[in-house]
Amino acid sequence: MIIVESNLDVADNSGARRVQCIKVLGGSKRRTASVGDVIVVSIKDAIPRGKVKKGDVHQAVVVRTAYPVRRADGSVIRFDRNAAVLINKQMEPIGTRIFGPVTRELRARKFMKIISLAPEVL
């Protein structure tokens, strides 16, 4: 469960390392984001010569959360840390590689490019 000011790891090679949520998209009263939701983030830590730099504002899709995600079959999946993948205005990832597992919930949200780049889908 991601709220405003939550810090997330970046699970791609766009050049960002850490981001901070500054807005949860999807309605004026929406307060929390879960796996598959799009958020607006500010880059807090980035590597030199990356595609993004510190202070940039981008959209990102949440791919892993520490808060448990309950599925229709009753199973629950959670991760050690929160992570996101930076995306552009066309909802395609900025990076060319995805690090770590992603969840099946992204398929229902039509993030097929992220699913295909991920090494493991849980």
From Swiss-Prot:
GO terms for cellular component: cytosolic large ribosomal subunit. InterPro entries: Ribosomal_uL14 (IPR000218), Ribosomal_uL14_bac-type (IPR005745), Ribosomal_uL14_CS (IPR019972), Ribosomal_uL14_sf (IPR036853). One of its GO terms (molecular function) is large ribosomal subunit rRNA binding. GO terms for biological process: translation. It comes from the Bacteria. Gene3D superfamilies: Ribosomal protein L14. Keywords: Ribonucleoprotein, Ribosomal protein, RNA-binding, rRNA-binding. HAMAP family: Ribosomal_uL14 (MF_01367). Belongs to the universal ribosomal protein uL14 family. Part of the 50S ribosomal subunit. Forms a cluster with proteins L3 and L19. In the 70S ribosome, L14 and L19 interact and together make contacts with the 16S rRNA in bridges B5 and B8. PANTHER family: 50S/60S RIBOSOMAL PROTEIN L14/L23 (PTHR11761), LARGE RIBOSOMAL SUBUNIT PROTEIN UL14M (PTHR11761:SF3). Binds to 23S rRNA. Forms part of two intersubunit bridges in the 70S ribosome. This is Large ribosomal subunit protein uL14. The gene is rplN.
